[in-house]
Amino acid sequence: MRNWSWIVGLLVIVAAAEAHWDFLLGVQNGHAAVILPHPQPLQNMSLLFGQYIRELGIEYYYENGRPQLSAASVQTVWISPGLIGRIGSTDVACQSGCPNYFTMPEDGHLHIRFRATQPGIYIWDLRVVDAIDIDGNPVQDMEGVYRIYFKAGNPHYLYGSVDAPNYQGDLYPLNLTVQIRQGSQTVQTVSMPPVPNALHAYMASFEQAGSYTVVAKLDKHLSRRVDNLNLSGGVQADWQFLVIGDVNNDDLIDDADLLMVLFAFGTNEFAADANGDGIVDDADLLLVLFNFGASGEGRD
């Protein structure tokens, strides 16, 4: 009887997943887009047969009784280690060895099942690409990414906002690194790109609860630090990165950063573009010179 109850429970979960959509694809401002919901709510994964599982339904958005799209594909831009998305019997989204791309079927209705083996917070960043509207016209690819957070089990995690007021570009190409420390020892490090318009700009899970020093660093910016943070369950930690110019990301603004900017001067080299405006010029040079000699709080 116990085995039958597991099967019945699984069928109930699958039936519930089949009965609704989790996000809708359409057209917004001339680009392919995820129309609803914004932001995507936290997806809680269920533990079944030793794996954490969550199935997501994807459909086309309807307007005046007609779908906005007749075709579209979904591209994985970034995915957490250990999270795998499968359609049917094929893994289509994972960190390595998957196509990280799939095409919607003709009926515009698809389910993708995600799995993970360990508790934690997992991330799937996607773009809608190669879309065609209902009248047969090609649609420009989605701008930016759409982020979905998954929660497996009861992890200890940090979440919050990421603000970089002196950076003019998109924050997504920058890497956010969050580290927990005890004394001089680094206990664990988690990295991801931030998405300010998601449910939270970042969510990062850690294996052990405890009291830690937390250090966060955003590429091209000096690190910030919070001491004696009690990490247990979900804890909010918002980050504002004010000091910019660390283009080589060693948490110190010095000769190495100055040389990077000088050698790339007049180009659009992303790594040396301190302020993110798309060109390496006087503004980047002035930022490095103004903050010359400064070091991140995580180096103290």
Where in this protein do the model-derived segments appear?
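Alpha-helical segments with a strong preference for the paired helices of cellulosomal dockerin domains
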Residues: 247-268, 277-298
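Structured interaction patches on ligand/partner-binding surfaces of diverse proteins
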Residues: 220-242
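Short tyrosine-centred short linear motifs in exposed loops/low-complexity segments
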Residues: 110, 118-123, 210
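Contiguous segments within soluble domain cores/interaction surfaces
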Residues: 20-111, 132-154, 167-169, 175-184
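Short Pro-Gly-centered beta-turn/loop motif in secreted/extracellular proteins
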Residues: 196-212, 219
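Short, acidic Ser/Thr/Gly-rich low-complexity loop/linker segments typical of extracellular
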Residues: 182-200
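Structural motif
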Residues: 159-174, 181-183, 248-253
